[in-house]
UniProtKB/Swiss-Prot annotation:
It comes from the Bacteria. The keyword Chaperone does not apply. It comes from Polynucleobacter necessarius subsp. necessarius (strain STIR1). The gene is rpsO. Part of the 30S ribosomal subunit. Forms a bridge to the 50S subunit in the 70S ribosome, contacting the 23S rRNA. This is Small ribosomal subunit protein uS15. GO terms for molecular function: rRNA binding; structural constituent of ribosome. Pfam families: Ribosomal_S15. InterPro entries: Ribosomal_uS15, Ribosomal_uS15_bac-type, uS15_NS1_RNA-bd_sf. GO terms for biological process: translation. Belongs to the universal ribosomal protein uS15 family.
Length: 89
């Protein structure tokens, strides 16, 4: 259920600060969002899969921590990323 390599490369290319950037918070949040979005339909079909749900909650909390860090460091970048990923209604 991992995000495909081609999709990962596309996400990294769209959100990277420089050519070889894979570790910036923007890239990490975007990759986590893609993984979370891929797992969400699984839990609608498999409501009793608590072990995988625990992993999903860890990903969500990691994304939340990265977003909090980004909000403290660069508010404009944070707002642009939230808008781009559609995380807030």
């Amino acid at each position: 259920m991992a995000v495909a390599d081609i999709k990962t490369a596309k996400i990294v290319k769209e959100n990277a600060r420089s050519a070889n950037d894979t570790g910036s918070p923007e890239v990490q949040v975007s990759l986590l969002t893609a993984r979370i979005n891929e797992l969400t339909p699984h839990f609608k079909a498999n409501t009793k899969d608590h072990h995988s749900r625990c992993g999903l909650l860890k990903m969500v909390s990691r994304r939340r921590r990265l977003l909090d860090y980004l909000k403290g460091k660069d508010l404009d970048c944070y707002r642009a990323l939230i808008e781009k990923l559609g995380l807030r209604k």
